Every structure is written in structure tokens, then in C-alpha cells.
Amino acid sequence: MAKKVVTDLDLKDKKVLVRVDFNVPMKDGKITNDNRIVAALPTIEYILEQNGKAILFSHLGKVKTEEDKEGKSLRPVAARLSELLGKEVKFVPTTRGPELEKAIDELKDGEVLLFENTRFEDIDGKKESKNDPELGKYWASLGDVFVNDAFGTAHRAHASNVGIASNLESAAGFLMEKEIKFIGGVVDNPARPLVAILGGAKVSDKIGVIENLLTKADKVLVGGGMTFTFMAAQGQEIGKSLLEADKVELAKGLLEKAGNKLVLPVDAVVSKEFSNDAPFHTVSADSIPADEMGLDIGQATIDLFTKELQGAKTVVWNGPMGVFELSNFAKGTIGVCEAIANLTDATTIIGGGDSAAAAMDLGFADKFTHISTGGGASLEYLEGKELPGVASISDK
């Protein structure tokens, strides 16, 4: 990649600012999933090995008012990171000012500091989220070099990524480098055949991705709630299934443009209610009863998609095939996940979000080449958009 990576920087004796993505799920002040903290370890450990001083910061949730601060402190993250690194992580409960500056000045080579949630700066005028130039400049003044390892926020121009990078030599961390390599590789130079599998509820969320991938992929397999808008565009009866009526014409246009590249489900698991307790059965895609709704793909579609995947050299998957959180309608997602996991000769990528959670829940995570840490960021990358957080990293 043409961007600087952390290994391109001289880190010895340097104050290294690191934008990490520690936006982890919390419940009652406890971290319920530490994947994002674990994902940042290689970059942090490399900086420490090089005798740099690691100054870490991240956002956590949305913070608009003083009340929102409740439960949004990064203090529990500092404690967990300390356990994972096996060394002390100094936590500074502020985002600017003398306390933070003093703590940074006192840091020794090979030590780690984490300061408070960057979004606490959003309470007074959204300074973080609107990339306030003064804030970006101030944070940049706290370090000698900047490493951006937060792919999850790369699609946003914030003070803590773009703002700092505008004022300081910057590089991608190892996680960011990996994301650019795999997600960027799908868009720029995939090994072929490239098969994309897109699911999720709404066409509107995935229009850009479908449009872009139809120009790049050899096949695009569509599942999830958005299939019914495509079926309606073909004149099929979809009963009470989810429909975005204002997107039917658009779906029609995509179908015409796609030809046989776009593959839709041939059957559906239907029920009268959006519930795990109601009776359900499988029907062919063109005969969904008027009083029922499609909530998953059926076995014939799982078999069809499995067949379409055979021989693929690159597979990218984003979005569940049905209402994955209800066990009666999770079989499609499980089947597709398994089919991708069983491909031995392909680069297999999950574009974050619900699909990543599904693969982890099912114990298939280690069977995939890459699982993205950024749902929104990977989607925008797959749309072919330039990501501000990536673009702002110094060129080699």
C-alpha cells in the first residue's frame, strides 16, 4: 500500500499518539466483548518493543450531553488492556489540559497511557465529530508521530484521526494496514472469480455496495430482508415480507443492469408472525402466501449459494441471510457461513457487523481469512468511496 505503516516510522524515544478503536460493548460498567482491544495489541506491542511511548485514545459510544458520560468512560478498557499487555496502563480521566500534558511528559520509553473518551469533546459543540481544527492541532501537539489503527472510524473525518494527521507525520497501524489490504483488495485487485454475498434488511443500506460490486464481482448473491424488494421488482408476490416500496424501481434497474450476475433466493422460510414461537414453513420464492412474511432463505437457496461459491478465489460477505437473532430463522445465515468457511482455496472476508458476530457465535471465525473490525467503514470502502481516515495517513 502507498501509505506509511508503523514500521516506516522511527519510534525510539518518541511520543507515539495512537488512535485505536476501543468502542467495545459495555454492560453495567463491564466489557462484554474485548475483540477490538485484542485487535489493537500487535500495534501497541510493536511500539513498546521499539522503545516508543504509547499514548492511546479512542471514542466509546455517542456522547452529546453530560448525562451521556455515564458508563462511557474508558477506565474499564485501561484495566482490561493492562491485563492483556501484562503491564500497567496509566489512565488519564480527561481529554486535554495540564493533567494530561504532565502525564505524557512523565511517560518513559516502553510505557503506555490511555486518555479519556474522545467523544467527551462533543458535549461542547461536537469538537471531535466535526473535526474542530484547534482540537486536532492540540492533540497533535502532544506527540511526535501519529499512528492511526482505528479502521472502524476511518469513514469519518474526526479530530482524533484526520485532525491529528493534518498536523503530524502519520502512519497506519497493523490492523489498519490489514483492513486496507483485504477490504481494499476486493475493490481494487481481487483474485477471481470474486463472489459477493450481501444480506441485511434494507436495500437502501446496501445500494452503493451492490452498484459498485456489480461492476467488480463475477457474482453477487443477495439474501436477507432486502431480497423482497428485488422480488417485488420482478413482479413476484411477497406477502407481508419487508418491502421498501420507494426502492422497487431502483431494484428493477439494478436487476436489468446485472443480468445473470445477481442471484436471488429461490425459496423462503415464512411465518405469519415475526416471532420464534409462531409456526413456520418453507415455500418457493414465487409463492409466498399473502398473509405470511419471509424471514430466512430456505435449504434450496443455501444449496444454490453453496454451488455458486464453488471455485471462487475471493469471497466477501456482508449481512445475514435472515432474522439471525431468532433461532428458527438463523439456518440460512449458518448455512452460508459454513459454506464460505469450508472453502479452502479462497480469500474469504467478512465485512464486519452482524456477519462477523454470526461467524464468531458459530465458532467459524478462524476459518475466514479476514474479519473486518469496521461495519460502516468496510461498507463505504466496498462502495468504492475514499475513506478520510485512510486518505489522511502520510504517503510513503
UniProtKB/Swiss-Prot annotation:
Give the record's GO CC terms.
Answer: cytosol
Q: Which UniProt keywords apply?
A: ATP-binding, Cytoplasm, Glycolysis, Kinase, Nucleotide-binding, Transferase
Q: Does the keyword Mitochondrion apply?
A: no
Domain of life from the UniProt record: Bacteria
Q: Which pathway or pathways does this protein act in?
A: Carbohydrate degradation; glycolysis; pyruvate from D-glyceraldehyde 3-phosphate: step 2/5
Q: Which residues form a coiled coil?
A: none
Main subcellular location: cytoplasm
Q: Which Gene3D superfamilies match?
A: Phosphoglycerate kinase, N-terminal domain
- Binding residue positions for ATP: K206, G294, E325, G352, G353, D354, S355
Per the record, what are the reactions this protein catalyses?
Answer: (2R)-3-phosphoglycerate + ATP = (2R)-3-phospho-glyceroyl phosphate + ADP
Name of the featured protein: Phosphoglycerate kinase
What is the native source organism of this protein? Answer: Listeria monocytogenes serotype 4b (strain CLIP80459)
Q: What is the lineage of its organism?
A: Bacteria, Bacillati, Bacillota, Bacilli, Bacillales
Q: Which gene encodes it?
A: pgk
